[in-house]
UniProtKB/Swiss-Prot annotation:
Gene: SLX1A
Function: Catalytic subunit of the SLX1-SLX4 structure-specific endonuclease that resolves DNA secondary structures generated during DNA repair and recombination. Has endonuclease activity towards branched DNA substrates, introducing single-strand cuts in duplex DNA close to junctions with ss-DNA. Has a preference for 5'-flap structures, and promotes symmetrical cleavage of static and migrating Holliday junctions (HJs). Resolves HJs by generating two pairs of ligatable, nicked duplex products.
A GO MF label: zinc ion binding
Pfam families per UniProt: GIY-YIG, SLX1_C
UniProt keyword annotation of Glycoprotein present: no
Record bears the keyword Kinase: no
Gene3D superfamilies noted in UniProt: GIY-YIG endonuclease, Zinc/RING finger domain, C3HC4 (zinc finger)
Gene Ontology, cellular component aspect: Slx1-Slx4 complex
Protein name (database record): Structure-specific endonuclease subunit SLX1
Length: 267
């Protein structure tokens, strides 16, 4: 996975009076562009299930997946809950239950089921007027957000300092070491850094994960833990997000194909 990638699984709601209430679940790396494609039809890159039935509104998106594969698996399970062994307890759509309400019910159980329950996901309502409380509610480490995803920030000048403006050459051979294992951090590695002011923690992802998982030896992915440096509480998802923001690259030319593979069967 490239640093700074955005992988989201969204819920569309149809506003067309002839098809009002229909929904569509999809995957995207660019929410704003994707909803334009849906409303533009197949010729603009929209899905065949949404083509000619617009306008569509993207009302909800779940993001923070560690990879495109993880997001696509989440998308598939949300689309086919009866076929997912993780969601056999959810049950079918009830008589009189709106399609939108059913998809929210499925989502609520997905966020509480493994493997998704341990991912650093964010539940974001793009349209606050569509918001409904999920039952059961998301885990405490999954924040609830509103509005469009924040724009991608430019990479920070990690080596910038007073000397940069003075015309001095930056130091080239600085030996930066992991706070936990004391081994050197290689140039190609993106260390995790504590965001709290005054804390100098810089650590390998694996080293900090092992530190956080000491209280949960049976797990592979941490949720949160105390910073070994300043002892402040840290959410694992926040650390990963900050790490990506600091090493982000432009991906407009290498964007993943967003059309679901099942759509290809209809062409």
């Amino acid at each position: 996975m490239g640093p700074g990638c955005f992988f989201g699984v969204y819920l569309l709601y149809c506003l067309n009076p002839r098809h009002r209430g229909r929904v569509y679940v999809g995957f995207t790396v660019n929410p704003a562009r994707r909803v334009q494609q849906h409303n533009g039809g197949r010729k603009k890159g929209g899905a065949w299930r949404t083509s000619g039935r617009g306008p569509w509104e993207m009302v909800l998106i779940v993001h923070g997946f560690p990879s495109a594969v993880a997001a696509l698996r989440f998308e598939w399970a949300w689309q086919h809950p009866q076929a997912s062994r993780r969601l056999t307890h959810v049950g079918r759509r009830l008589r009189g239950e709106a399609t939108f309400a059913f998809h929210l019910r499925v989502l609520a159980h997905m966020l509480r089921a493994p493997p998704w329950v341990r991912l650093p996901l964010t539940l974001r309502w793009l349209r606050a007027d569509f918001r409904q409380d999920l039952c059961p509610p998301p885990p405490p480490h999954m924040p609830l957000a509103f509005g469009p995803p924040p724009p991608r920030a430019p990479p920070p000048r990690s080596q910038a300092g007073p000397s940069d403006d003075m015309g001095f050459e930056p130091q080239q051979d600085v030996d930066v070491r992991c706070t936990l294992c004391a081994r050197a951090l290689q140039d190609e590695e993106s260390p995790l850094c504590c965001p709290h002011p005054g804390c100098s923690l810089r650590a390998h992802v694996i080293c900090l994960a092992e530190e956080f998982l000491q209280e949960e030896p049976g797990q592979l992915l941490p949720l949160e833990g105390a910073c070994p440096g300043c002892k402040n509480s840290l959410l694992w998802g926040d650390l990963i997000w900050l790490c990506r923001m600091g090493t982000e690259e432009d991906e407009e030319d290498s964007e993943l194909e967003e059309e679901h593979w099942t759509d290809m069967l209809k062409t």
